[in-house]
C-alpha cells in the first residue's frame, strides 16, 4: 500500500497514486483531445458566422475561452504525472492553473449574458434596442475579460516565492502571505459569481418558458413543436451547468479553506482534495459539451456546419414569414434560447 501513496500536489497528506498519477491524467488527456477537436471545429464554423446578433458575439467568446482552457490541460497532465522538469509544476502553479480558471469563469459569465439577452428579447422586447446592439455586446465582452483578468492575475503575480531545489512543488507553498489571502478572496469571488449566474439562468429561463408557452397557447400554432424545442434548448444549458459546474462550486469553498487554514485534519484534506480534483475534471469536461449547445442554441451555426459538411438541413416553418412581428420574435428566440 505504501508504494501506491504519494504526497498530493496540495498539502502534506498522502494520496493514492493510482488516482492522482494515472486515472485523473488519463481522463484529462481524453478531455484535452476532444476539447481541442470540438472547439477547433466550432471556431472554424463560427469564423463563417457573422456577428449579426449579440448572442452570437457571446457564443464566439465562449469558443475562445474553451479553446484556451483546453490548451492548459497538457501542463496539468505533465504536472500530475511528474514528467518533465520540476519547473513544469511551477509553471502550472503560477500560470496555467490561473489561465484555466480565467477561461472557465469567462465562459460561465457569457452563458449568463446569453440568458440575460434572451430574457430581454422575449420577455421585455421593448427594452432591447440598446442592450442587444452589437457594439454594446462587444463592449460588455471586453469588460468581462478585463474584470476576470483583474481578479485572477494577482494569483500569478503573488505566486512569487522562489524554488531552489528540484523537490515536489506545492502550489500553496509558492504563494506569499498576501498571495494566500488573495487566493482565498478570489476563490470566494468566483464562487459567488457562479452562483449568481446559475440562479439568474434559472430565473431567466423560467420566465422565457412561461412567455413562449403563453404566446403559443394563445395563437394555438405549432405549440407542441415550440414546447419541445424550447424545453430541449433550456434543458441542454441547465444540464451542462448543473453537471459540470455545481459539484465543483459546492466543493470549492471547503477545499480552499483546507488549503489556507490549519485546523483541518489530514483525512479531511485528503477527501476534499479528491472531491475537488474530480469535480474540477467535470468542469473541464464542459469544453466538450459546449459545442453541442452551440448546435442547439444557434441556428446560423447549424446552417454553416451542415453546409460545410454537405449535409442537407431541413428548413422549418417556411410559411411563417407572413406572421406578425411579435410571433417572429418568439419563434426566432425559441431557436436561440
From Swiss-Prot:
**Intracellular or extracellular location(s):** Cell membrane
Q: Which residues lie on this side of the membrane: Cytoplasmic?
A: 50-54, 117-138, 209-233, 299-337
Q: Which Pfam families match?
A: 7tm_1
For this protein, the record's Gene3D superfamilies field holds: Rhodopsin 7-helix transmembrane proteins
Main localization (coarse):
membrane
Q: Which cysteines in this chain are paired by disulphide bridges?
A: 93-171
As for membrane topology, the entry says: Multi-pass membrane protein
UniProt key word Isomerase = no
- GO molecular function terms attached to this record: G protein-coupled purinergic nucleotide receptor activity
What's one GO-annotated cellular component?
plasma membrane
Which residues are exposed on the Extracellular face of the membrane?
A: 1-28, 76-95, 160-187, 255-277
Give the family from UniProt: Belongs to the G-protein coupled receptor 1 family.
Where exactly are the transmembrane stretches of this chain? 29-49, 55-75, 96-116, 139-159, 188-208, 234-254, 278-298
**Name under which the protein is recorded:** P2Y purinoceptor 14
Q: What are the record keywords, sorted?
A: Cell membrane, Disulfide bond, G-protein coupled receptor, Glycoprotein, Membrane, Receptor, Transducer, Transmembrane, Transmembrane helix
Q: Which residues are glycosylated?
A: 2, 162
Summary of the function given for this chain in its UniProt record = Receptor for UDP-glucose and other UDP-sugar coupled to G-proteins. Not activated by ATP, ADP, UTP or ATP.
What are the GO BP annotations of this UniProt entry?
A: G protein-coupled receptor signaling pathway
